[in-house]
Amino acid sequence: MICVDHLCYHYKGGRPILRDVSFELEDGRFLAVLGNNGVGKSTLLKCMNRILTADSGHCRIDGEDLLTLSHREIAKRVAFVAQHVPDTQMTVHDMVMLGRRPYMTWGVTEHDHHVVHEAMRYLNLEDMRGRFLNQLSGGERQKVMLARALAQEPTLLLLDEPTSNL
């Protein structure tokens, strides 16, 4: 279960962008946050994976406050696909493999390879595995980032305008 409890956030020198946001989301459920530009949708998602730290309030995953978890532990539980996709000279396979990084302590395992293969297969990226991201269209890069997020096997998947380039 995901619990956002009285979350507040403001940017330095700016007006409050999140004011007393609260909701609970049961496992297996979906939540869409809709609104105009600049109302805090992306900010909420960034607070939900501790890219940003809220001024007050709490985000909990299965009862554990994100503030008590290490960034590595958060990365195991929360995958975030940003609306802006990097344009990098990394292969599709290597970018998706980055999704497994929080689990890697002694190198890449057979399970890591299997999870990455399945994420790429699910999004029809197998034929692109050796191509570089900077050679792909915006939509193709967005699919790669989604595959990377799925390869994390997260408890919580946060998608910030995941189809803006598709």
Region annotations inferred by a language model:
Residues 1-4, 8-20, 27-32, 68-70:
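A short, flexible loop at the N-terminus of ABC-type nucleotide-binding domains that lies
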Residues 34-36:
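The feature captures the beta-strand-to-loop junction immediately N-terminal to the Walker
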Residues 49:
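Helix-to-loop junction immediately C-terminal to a conserved catalytic motif
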Residues 57-65, 74:
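Conserved ABC transporter NBD signature motif
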Residues 132-136, 140:
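Conserved ABC ATPase signature
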Residues 146:
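Hydrophobic anchor residue at the start of the ABC signature
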Residues 151-155:
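A short, proline-enriched helix->beta-strand linker immediately N-terminal to the Walker B motif
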Residues 157-161:
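Catalytic Walker B motif of ABC-type/P-loop ATPase nucleotide-binding domains
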